[in-house]
Amino acid sequence: MGSGYQLLQLPRERFRKTSFLVWVIILFQRAISMPLGIVTNSTLKATEIDQLVCRDKLSSTSQLKSVGLNLEGNGIATDVPSATKRWGFRSGVPPKVVSYEAGEWAENCYNLEIKKSDGSECLPLPPDGVRGFPRCRYVHKVQGTGPCPGDLAFHKNGAFFLYDRLASTVIYRGTTFAEGVIAFLILSEPKKHFWKATPAHEPVNTTDDSTSYYMTLTLSYEMSNFGGEESNTLFKVDNHTYVQLDRPHTPQFLVQLNETLRRNNRLSNSTGRLTWTVDPKIEPDVGEWAFWETKKTFPNNFMEKTCISKFYQPTPTTPQIRARRELSKEKLATTHPPTTPSWFQRIPLQWFQCSLQDGQRKCRPKV
């Protein structure tokens, strides 16, 4: 009997280690990491946000900061033919609009003006107070026609169209937007003793130097059968010169293409439409899919290095399109423009550690 009891009894040292491990598990369950709450079309009500994020986690809703996060950070294709396939028309679904407080710089934004075959508009005008997304590196301005089988254009993946501090579930006519979602950052309240010392006010030199701003470059397109399975996209160089876009490409590729056509006098010199097709051997992913360039450095990035040296035209299909011709066969080496680092290129996502103190749950950023 005694020996049996000895088998069930843990040695003193092992008992200490086991009880310590149990306490660690209990405390770990009490103080868990809390992720960001991502809000999509189906969770727009404040009460739902309170139940999901705020209950027993925050002392006040002032600790919630709504932030617009761009989808392009997830690595989605941003060229116009690929992006437009993510949008579709639906009827009978009321649009929803939600405000957000802060956002990111967008590498790619879009601006659509689409008409039906009878000349009527496919997209509604923006409501009062809805302005275009204010921070875009490239604005892809698309004009064209399509069947538009529905009242409003929605995002097929349930994402938002981000405008200036307003996010909507629908696309508005002629209003620049970025694709994204709304996230809620949970900020810990500062302790009172943080502010006991008198703050030191240092002089700040404000400047209106426009060379320090980011430049927005608008790229124009014409599209037919918008929203259909077989849509056709043309990059517009000028009113009479276009380039057929058959493959995914970077905005930097289109900038180089535009510069090459102009430098080599390949623009249309008549009233007829001249349509170029890019040689299939040319890689359309010059540069990077998402990077920043300042206005100060931008003009020199593509002027001296040209990696696109040959284009050819398709066989004429209408009398207005001029005869097929080919450029020289040589191909220069592809040179990638350098990436300009920026500390505010992305808003960091932060996790928060919560624990019970004096009967209240306190949250602080997790280090």
From Swiss-Prot:
Record site feature (Cleavage), residues: R325, E326
Residue stretches in coiled coil: none
UniProt key word Nucleotidyltransferase: no
Protein origin, superkingdom: Viruses
Gene Ontology terms: biological process: monoatomic ion transmembrane transport
GO cellular component: extracellular region; host cell membrane
Residues carrying covalently attached carbohydrate according to the record: N41, N205, N239, N258, N269
Residues in the signal sequence: 1-33
Keyword Disulfide bond: yes
Record InterPro entries: GPC_FiloV (IPR014625), GPC_filovir-type_extra_dom (IPR002561)
Disulfide bonds: C109-C136, C122-C148
Transmembrane segment boundaries: none
Recorded family membership: Belongs to the filoviruses glycoprotein family.
Name of this protein: Pre-small/secreted glycoprotein
Organism per entry: Reston ebolavirus (strain Philippines-96) (REBOV)
Gene: GP
